[in-house]
Design a protein with these regions (language model features):
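Elongated alpha-helical scaffolds
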Residues: 1-8
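Active-site helix-to-loop segments that bind/position phosphate- or nucleotide-bearing substrates
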Residues: 9-202, 209-225
């Protein structure tokens, strides 16, 4: 609900408890979300191919080639491949070109991402079977040993989330064993949704994944779109 002439003073939102005055970052988020093309496609000016972590992109392309054997994109150079994915773009009207928000976050070097998104942090903690004097028994956060982009965060954390899940013996067609259960898929989907629906342009936020003995917690900045 919007009342008056100043959106920062007259905007209200409603939750299960009633109406409340929207915060400035919620209002800025609503204004950004008016973009019909979405924010992922936004060109991050002055961020170019040098800001892409080559090893991250190589790993992604390797997975892409395995899953899409014979695809015409497999023969493209890295820049052209990113353009096809929407990770690099040129605005034909202004001539401005560069990595998109999605391209930088997904494949960028940790330094480039931290320079542009110093408000966003990635954190995984295994809090299952902890005691009163131990806060966690495993953690992944930025420590200088890995390029903290979204692709690396996803590929490093996903195996840790699913390694303890039960895998009942089941054969597909009586021949091939199926190790991927509905629970495995649900956990991955929750992780992916956390990444997709995060608002990376907020003032501050943490992509937080917590593994507990009986549940998984996925927390991100922003709301479902």
């Amino acid at each position: 609900v919007y009342v008056g002439e100043n959106p920062y003073k007259g905007t209200y939102k409603r939750n299960h408890e009633g109406d409340y005055h929207a915060t400035n970052y919620e209002i800025r988020g609503m204004i950004r979300d008016q973009n019909p093309e979405g924010n992922d496609n936004q060109i991050i000016e002055y961020y170019m191919m040098d800001d892409i972590d080559k090893e991250t992109l190589r790993k992604y392309r390797q997975i892409f080639e395995i899953r899409n054997e014979g695809h015409v994109w497999n023969s493209l150079d890295d820049k052209s491949f990113l353009e096809k994915l929407g990770g690099y773009r040129k605005d034909r009207r202004t001539g401005v070109e560069g990595l998109t928000l999605a391209g930088l976050l997904m494949f960028g070097t940790g330094q480039a991402i931290r320079e542009r998104f110093d408000n966003i942090f990635m954190d995984y903690r295994n809090e299952s079977q902890v005691t009163s004097d131990i806060r966690w028994n495993d953690r992944i956060t930025y420590d200088g040993t890995w390029e903290n982009n979204l692709f690396n965060f996803f590929t490093k954390v996903t195996p840790k989330l699913t390694e303890d899940l039960k895998k009942p013996f089941k054969l597909e067609g009586g021949i091939q064993r199926i190790d991927d259960t509905p629970v495995h898929k649900a956990v991955r989907e929750g992780f992916v949704n956390m990444i997709i629906h995060a608002d990376y342009l907020m003032d501050a936020g943490v992509l937080k994944v917590i593994k507990k003995s009986d549940e998984f917690e996925f927390t991100n900045p922003g709301i479902l779109k």
